[in-house]
């Protein structure tokens, strides 16, 4: 069995240019406050750590919002127009 790296192409090794491009794309996904100036290969480790931290914070935020929504829904009449609107948004 062979292991695959990269996504698609010819099965060769990923180039430094491709790594730098992926780092730039990943950096662009982070909020402005988490971005480091001039991502280079030496900062790839830092960028990956920041990305992991950001993803964890997003998970916490989703959990918090889910809890808040559950609390809100438990206080509403299930047949109310507001409850129906919320249900339609969740579909």
From Swiss-Prot:
A molecular function (GO) term: protein dimerization activity
BP term (GO), one: regulation of DNA-templated transcription
Cell membrane as UniProt keyword: no
Occurrences of domain bHLH (ranges): 3-58
Keyword Transcription regulation tagged: yes
Keywords: Growth regulation, Transcription, Transcription regulation
Family recorded in the similarity comment: Belongs to the bHLH protein family.
Role this protein plays: Atypical and probable non DNA-binding bHLH transcription factor that integrates multiple signaling pathways to regulate cell elongation and plant development.
Subunit structure comment from the entry: Interacts with LO9-177.
Protein name in UniProt: Transcription factor ILI3
Protein's gene: ILI3
